[in-house]
Amino acid sequence: MNEILTLVTFLALLFYTGIEMKFQLQMLQQNSYRNDRYNRWLKGESFASVSRLTDLFLLLLLSTNFLPTFVQIVTITVVLAKSVKGLQTKYKKPLVFTKRATRLYIAVLLLSLLVAGLAAGLTTLSNGSRALLAIAILAPYFMMTANIIMQPVEKRINRKYYDEAKQILSQMQDLTVIGITGSYGKTSTKHYLYRILCERYNVLMTPGSFNTPMGVIRTIREQMKPYHNIFICEMGAKQIGDIKEICDLVAPQIGIITAVGEQHLESFKTIGNVQRTKFELVDALPGSGLAVINNDFPYIANRPVENVPVKRYTIADTGADYHIEDIRYDTDATRFTVVGGGERIELSTKLIGECNLSNLMAAVITARHLQVPVPSIQYGVSRIEQVEHRLNMKRTPGGISIIDDAFNSNPDGARMALDVLRRMTQGKRIIITPGMIELGEKQVEYNYLLGKQIAEVCDYVMVVGRYNSCLLYTSPSPRDAHES
């Protein structure tokens, strides 16, 4: 009986270790498989969490001779319960088992089995169980070790994929490549531009948030066809050189910068580094190309561009090349006029908020440069659907209006979302938010400012989690505040 219980304990801990490694792989994937970024994320997590302290307590019990049968039963029960909870937890950005993720997961499991197997084979199965629990506790470090071991393999595979993507692009003689980057707004702008250009061209865009070099390479290898005229390539970055790496691959002729703001400051450190990185796209453009950049942001407006023709756009500054006039929010649509290039283009859209109108303007400017007729642009804009979790308006059967802007948050985007909420004059205005993250040393400052802005607009606020609970104490204006 004891031998069976010991075996079941070992298997339960093996299963639990696999679940824990899956979560760590998810976090590593979200940090671009880079140990340095993943390690920065780890520093923001408490080692003394309830879950980890529970594991440490179980390890202590398993290391003693105190009621061994009872301890094993408790261990099995606890780790299986935690495993089930781990499997049932839903994440905004779940793990995607790409080929690379699968290889790394297998590698870290083999590494874990090797250590546990040595402990069990050289001593006893009970020691193997203790080793597995210790591995689960130290899962982040096993994950980083496995990642280091797999680096030579991944570099060789990535080089092969890179060369294949380059070869495909070299065969697309008439392809126009449009790069889009920005601290925020790039994914929405990509979708809007795609919808408009499809009125005239065969267009391929990077799907979802595929904005890393490997995401771009995968799109080219798997989806690019000889009949494509235009490739819209979203370009993300968390450090200097990231945009240049993608530009070296795809060689864009047109570049759009939607924003330069204080986001990802944990990795960029300064707003100057953000500006430098985003403008790697403009710097990569040929003299015959075009840069379309948003002058509503000071770090774009004050950056000279000399290597390529440029069109600067703003919401309201009539001194820019393009701006917007006559904004009207009707019950069923937003109506506005894009003014610039000697034209006044009247448009109607289902989208709400000035940030969306700004992104639409960038798409319209680019479409006109590519000779898309005005009627086609007007039709395309009218058919654009809201992008999920990006200032997306929903209405419930009970008459509640929900503005879903949950994809991420940043100082400027949050301010614009609150401005949309401010314009809703009927009913109570309620905000649910975890605050803003990845702002480095300005984390507290900007969340404090967000709290003040919320107090001016909202009747109720619910702060999700404790990380940015400072939002609760910025002003007494919200009549009710709740932290969960």
Task: Give residue ranges: language-model regions.
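Acidic, Mg2+-coordinating active-site environments of NTP-dependent enzymes
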Residues: I257-S401, Q426-G427, K452-Y460, R466-S475
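Conserved strand-to-helix beginnings and helix N-cap segments that scaffold or border functional pockets
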Residues: I217, I243, F268-I271, L360-M361, ...
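Residue-level marker for buried hydrophobic side chains located in beta-strands
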Residues: F231, I402, I431-I432
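Single conserved hydrophobic/aromatic residue that forms the stacking wall/gate
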Residues: Y473-S484
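Phosphate-binding loop of NTP-binding sites
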Residues: E3-K99, R103-A107, L111-N295, Y299-V308, ...
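Active-site beta-alpha connecting loops in nucleotide-dependent enzymes
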Residues: V84-V115, V387, N410-L472
